[in-house]
């Protein structure tokens, strides 16, 4: 391929498709980005959880956090709690907090934990976030700037509402072209690269 790419087609919507289209359009505004999705393929999933990296992704495509939270029924996610991780005893659990322990790059926290407090949970010894979660506290305060964090966080959200929210943002603010159609054929060039798509109603 020697010609510069000027047009990109994203096949498939949902959160993955619209995030891909949004990032391409936001970071490469000279490109013509089109998303093609079928009306006959429903969005999978209702609830969805993200890693903290989603905050950076939303920032990169120009989304305000308050708009995202209110329109996608989002709540903060500070980690994962695994119930009965080792056995079936009542109350036994394992926390995987999103906040990195302070100094983890410069010391062997595991060895220190085993020496100082082996009878306590690792997350409780090296990190405050499990206690924040157990107290049902948020990872930030109302006055904390959007996407900033006191403790690291991702989100729980409604996947269907998130996809619709992303679609509206990408089409209205990032000039992504939206085509609803079924793809019938993928056409490759002489080198095996995808050259074009054929659809039922748009050629």
Question: Whereabouts are the PLM-identified features?
Answer:
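Short beta-strand to alpha-helix junction loop
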Residues: 149-169, 178-181
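Dinucleotide-binding Rossmann-like beta1-alpha1 core, especially the glycine-rich loop
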Residues: 42, 46-135
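Beta1/beta-strand and adjacent pyrophosphate-binding region of the FAD-binding site
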Residues: 3-14
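Core beta-strand elements of the Rossmann-like FAD/NAD(P) dinucleotide-binding domain
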Residues: 200-203
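A conserved short coil-to-beta-strand element within the FAD-binding core of flavoproteins
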Residues: 177-196
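A short, Lys/Arg-enriched amphipathic alpha-helix followed by its capping loop at the start of a domain
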Residues: 20-31, 57-60, 173
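N-terminal Rossmann-fold NAD(P) dinucleotide-binding loop
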Residues: 17
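Glycine-rich FAD pyrophosphate-binding loop
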Residues: 25-46
């Amino acid at each position: 391929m020697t010609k510069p790419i000027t047009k990109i087609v994203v096949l498939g919507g949902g959160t993955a498709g619209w995030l891909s289209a949004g990032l391409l359009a936001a970071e490469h505004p000279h490109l013509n980005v089109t998303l093609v999705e079928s009306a006959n393929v429903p969005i999978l999933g209702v609830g969805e959880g993200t890693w903290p990296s989603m905050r950076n992704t939303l920032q990169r495509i120009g989304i305000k956090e308050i708009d995202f939270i209110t329109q996608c029924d989002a709540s903060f996610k500070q980690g994962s709690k695994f119930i009965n991780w080792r056995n079936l005893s009542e109350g036994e659990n394992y926390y995987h907090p999103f906040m990195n322990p302070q100094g983890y790059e410069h010391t062997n926290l595991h060895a220190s934990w085993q020496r100082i407090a082996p009878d306590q949970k690792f997350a409780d010894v090296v990190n405050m976030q499990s206690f924040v979660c157990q107290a049902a506290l948020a990872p930030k305060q109302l006055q904390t700037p959007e996407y900033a964090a006191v403790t690291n966080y991702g989100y729980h959200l409604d996947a269907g509402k998130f996809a619709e929210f992303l679609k509206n943002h990408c089409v209205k603010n990032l000039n992504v072209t939206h085509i609803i159609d079924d793809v019938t054929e993928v056409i490759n060039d002489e080198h095996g690269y995808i050259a074009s798509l054929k659809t039922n109603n748009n050629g």
